């Protein structure tokens, strides 16, 4: 007698169990995201000394605080905020995001804030430190200048606020001429009228004849570009020193 294969369908109870497991996993992920957000907010509101003391206490006991009930921590945090509101000025709202292991508080910026201050705060990686606000109409502070107005030198480092201008290219009106070489005169060979003219050369022959001329023209452009770059040698020297100090 041959064995008979019997197809067993999943019961409603197994499907309900699978759904409950999926709901539990999604709930854990949701609570984990809330916990991560709250931990980031707490780290943003603490000083580096508090964070160091907390890490030392965890390392000494070998236990970490329980995170099974995030709603209790939210309630405690709400009570602390209410206490701050009653006892002193309330802390301003924060919106801290973490991008590539660096955090920045976006609540301190408005919609019209340029991108550069936001990037500068992100590079600083200190969400608790706020950028100094400056009204759009207020003028920029004057730059410290010396006799030439190009740089300031103190005892520790060298702060450069303005690069020196390039050297003069020559007589007045020769600025463009310093970048563009003088044209190379064509080489013409006159033939007597009584001699018969040569037949028209092929394209390969013309390319071969003009190859040397093209090489000379390209070399003249390279020399003119090099001479023009020498006018900025002082600026390049300052930039090189700034790069080497990093």
Curated annotation (Swiss-Prot):
Keyword hit for Isomerase: no
InterPro entries named among the record's database cross-references: LIN37
Pfam families per UniProt: LIN37
Composition bias type Basic and acidic residues, residue spans: 39-55
One GO CC term, this protein: transcription repressor complex
Ranges where the record places region Disordered: 39-90, 129-208
Residues modified as N-acetylmethionine: 1
Example GO molecular function: protein-containing complex binding
Cross-link for Glycyl lysine isopeptide (Lys-Gly) (interchain with G-Cter in SUMO2), residue positions: 5, 7
Modified residues (Phosphoserine): 135, 138, 182, 202
GO annotation, biological process: G0 to G1 transition; gene expression
In-chain residues carrying the UniProt-annotated modification Phosphothreonine: 167
Superkingdom of this protein's organism: Eukaryota
Keyword annotations of the record: Acetylation, Isopeptide bond, Phosphoprotein, Ubl conjugation
Assembly description: Component of the DREAM complex (also named LINC complex) at least composed of E2F4, E2F5, LIN9, LIN37, LIN52, LIN54, MYBL1, MYBL2, RBL1, RBL2, RBBP4, TFDP1 and TFDP2. The complex exists in quiescent cells where it represses cell cycle-dependent genes. It dissociates in S phase when LIN9, LIN37, LIN52 and LIN54 form a subcomplex that binds to MYBL2.
Protein name (record): Protein lin-37 homolog
Protein source organism: Mus musculus
Taxon lineage: Eukaryota, Metazoa, Chordata, Craniata, Vertebrata
Gene giving rise to this polypeptide: Lin37
